[in-house]
Amino acid sequence: MNRKTPHALLALPAGIMLALLMAVPAHAALRVFACEPEWGALTQELGGTLVDVSVATSALQDPHQIQAKPSLIARARNADLVVCTGAELEIGWLPVLLQQSGNARVQAGQPGNFAAADFVRKLDVPGQLDRAQGDVHAAGNPHIQTDPRNIALVAAALGKRLQQVDPAHAAEYARAQADFAQRWQQAIVRWTAQAAPLKGAAVVSQHKAFVYLYDWLALKEVAVLEPKPGVEPTASHLQEVLATLKAAPARMVLYSAYQDPRPSEWLSKNAAIPAVKIAFTVGGTEGAKDLFGLFDDTVARLLAAGVKP
C-alpha cells in the first residue's frame, strides 16, 4: 500500500504546502476599538490572545478633544466591538467617527457598542443643563475610571459583552473575567487600606476629573482651578482660589498627566502645597503601565504628597 509519510509531505512543492496550511481553520482575533487607554487595558485583561485591541487615544491626550481622523475611522470600520466611556465624554468626535465608519456592528444600540459609564453610578449629574456653566455633561461626570470599584463593575459587564459578540469563546472570557475580578478585589482592599491616612483630606483639582477618586477615598474637594468645567484657569480665578485656601488650607492640588501643569504649579508655589500629577489612565505616568499599576501609582503619589512623615 502506498502511504504518504511525513517525509513525503515535506517533499511537496512549496505552493501546495502553503495551500494546505491555509486550509487549516485559524482563530481570527476579535477586533476591538477602545476610545481610552483604560478600556483598552481592561479589554486586554479579559480577552488576552482572543482580542486585537486598538486604542484611539493616549494618556497624554484630552479625551474630550479628539479629531475623527481617517486613521481612526478606518479602525472603527473594521472593529467587531467599540469600547468607550460614554456619558458624553466622546460626544465631540465619536458619533461622527462611527457614522463615517459605516460599520453597522458598532453603532449605538448594537451589541458591538459598549459604553462603560452605563454600568456605574454617575456623580455630578446636573439638576438642569446650562451650557453657561461650562463643559457640563448631562449624564454626569464621565471620568469614572478614577475609582477602582467602577472598574470592577465595568469589567463584569464587559466580560458578558465579549461573550455575547464572540460566543464561540464565551467560556474563555468567563474564566478570564472571574480571574480578573478576584485579583482586582484583592487589590482594591489593599489600595483602600494603604490610602486610609488620607481620609478627609482637603484637596484642590485643576479640572473636575477626580470626583470618583475622591468618593472612593473620602477626600474633600475644596476648590477647582478651572472657573468652569473645561474653561482654562484665569489669573483672577487663581487668586480667588488662593484666598480661599488661606482661610481653609488644602493638603495638595491634583492635575491629570495630559494637562498643562502650570496652573497647579502656580498654586503649589503660592499656597505652599504639593502639586500632584495623577496618571488618570494607563500610561499617564511611568508607574501606570497597566490597570493595577495605575492605582498603585495613584495611591503612592497621594500618600507621598498628603501624609506628613
Which residues does each PLM region occupy?
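N-terminal secretory signal peptides that target proteins for export/translocation
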Residues: 1-8
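Extracytoplasmic metal-acquisition and chelation regions
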Residues: 28-309
